[in-house]
Amino acid sequence: MTVSKIEVVADHLVRARRDNTLADAAPLAEALADAADAYAVQERVALELGWFGAAPPRYWKSGGASRDAVLTHAPLPPVGVWTSPARSGTWPFHLRGIEAEVALRLARDVDAALAATLDADSARTLIDAMAVSIELVDSRWREALEAPALCKLADLQSHGALVLGDWRAFEARDWRAQSCRVRIGAQAAVERRGTHSLGDPAFMLPAWLRHATRQGATLVAGTVVTTGTWVGILQAAEGDLVTAEFPGIGQASVQL
C-alpha cells in the first residue's frame, strides 16, 4: 500500500465533494493497486470530511455481481441518509441513478470476534428488521460509471444518497419469488422478480461484518446495511418522484 498515492486519490475526492466539482479518474487509474488501497481512500475521505467522528459508521452498502464475485463495501455519510418520504432538495448530484434495494438492520452489537465465526445462516440471526431502500447513484469522477473499478470503490462505490422506508420485522422469505416495482416520474414502471444478484440480500452479511470490524471496530445494534440493487441502475432526472415497492416488505420514495 503506497500512502502517497492513497493521499492523492483521497485529496481529489475531498476536493470534488467540497467544491461540487468532478475529478479526472484517468490519470489515477494506476494509483490504486487493490481493494485495500480503495478502502484506505474511503477512510481518509471520511476522516477529512468528518463524517463519523470517533464512532463506527451506522450506515453501509454492500454487495456484488454474484456469489462468486468478491463482495465490496462502503460506509455511507449519515447526512445523506434520509427517511421516506424524502426530498432531495438542494443535495448536489451529478448523476441520478436509481437502485431499488432491501436494507437490513443489526439487532445486536457485532465485534471482530463474533464476525469471524459467522456463516450466512448464523448471520441472519443478528438481523431484526428490514426496509425498502432507494440508493441514489452518483459519482465524483468525470468518467462517472466508466471510471476504473478501484476508483469507483474509493468513491463509496458510486454512492450519492440513501432513502429508507419503514422498518418491519425481518423474516425468512422466498427471495426468488420476491417482486419489486419502481416508478420514476412519467416513465413506465419497471417490475422485476427474484433478481437480486446474490439470490438472498442477507448472503453478504458475513463478508460485510468481517470487513466492517476488521480494524477492531464494534458495529452497534441498529447499524444498517443496504444490500444491492434488484433493477440495475435506472435513470432519473431533477423533478422526478421516485417510488420503489417490494410487496410484503414495504415501499420508499424520494422527490428529486
Language model: regions and residue ranges:
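Catalytic-core "active-site belt" of small-molecule-metabolizing enzymes
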Residues: 2-200, 206, 214, 235-241, ...
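A conserved acidic, glycine/proline-rich C-terminal tail/linker
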Residues: 204-233
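Short strand-turn-strand beta-turns centered on an Asx-Gly dipeptide
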Residues: 184-185, 227, 247
